[in-house]
From Swiss-Prot:
It comes from Angiopteris evecta. GO terms for molecular function: electron transporter, transferring electrons within cytochrome b6/f complex of photosystem II activity. Component of the cytochrome b6-f complex, which mediates electron transfer between photosystem II (PSII) and photosystem I (PSI), cyclic electron flow around PSI, and state transitions. The 4 large subunits of the cytochrome b6-f complex are cytochrome b6, subunit IV (17 kDa polypeptide, PetD), cytochrome f and the Rieske protein, while the 4 small subunits are PetG, PetL, PetM and PetN. The complex functions as a dimer. The keyword Oxidoreductase does not apply. It is found in: Plastid, Chloroplast thylakoid membrane. This is Cytochrome b6-f complex subunit 8. The keyword Transmembrane helix applies. One of its GO terms (biological process) is photosynthesis. The chain crosses the membrane at residues 3-23.
């Protein structure tokens, strides 16, 4: 596994986490 795929996977995880965090925040949780 090279550094590019690791960085891409980390970026996807951070993007998904922040997106769900925004959705939960707007839901008033």
């Amino acid at each position: 596994m090279d550094i590019v795929s690791i960085a891409w996977a980390a970026l996807m995880v951070v993007f998904t986490f922040s997106l769900s965090l925004v959705v939960w925040g707007r839901s008033g949780l």
